[in-house]
Amino acid sequence: LAEFLQQLPRDFQYAVEVRNSELLTPAYFKALNEAGVTHCFNHWNSMIPLHLQMRAAADAGGLTADFFIARLLTPLGTSYQNAEEQFAPYDKVQRPNSQMRADVVKLLRRALATNKRAFVTANNKAEGNSPLTMVSIAKLFLENAAP
């Protein structure tokens, strides 16, 4: 991975998404940092929660890229197909995930504190309706904003 990342043009922002927590090693984060690449925090079936991914990055010395990214894909422990079956027709939030939302807010606050940009995408299969998931995260962020 490190060799591949070093070959990438430097005039673009890159993120690597892994979906196996055993890959979140100090060597992984070192390879990202040496190439100016960030980890794509992902909320996915078999991945560890976002806050544990953030902890793994912090324990390895942090991320040095100038941005963070998170993808909210499915509830933990729920396959893409099962989420699709449970949440269709995606017209409302069907299973709010307070921990996932709080973790995203934590990532956004970290971005602000370190003067980095943050990108967050949500899939309808995360809670049932991605626009409403994003609205809920924005409200949570604003509710807990310092005056």
Locate predicted features.
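Residues lining hydrophobic/aromatic ligand-binding pockets adjacent to catalytic sites
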Residues: 1-147
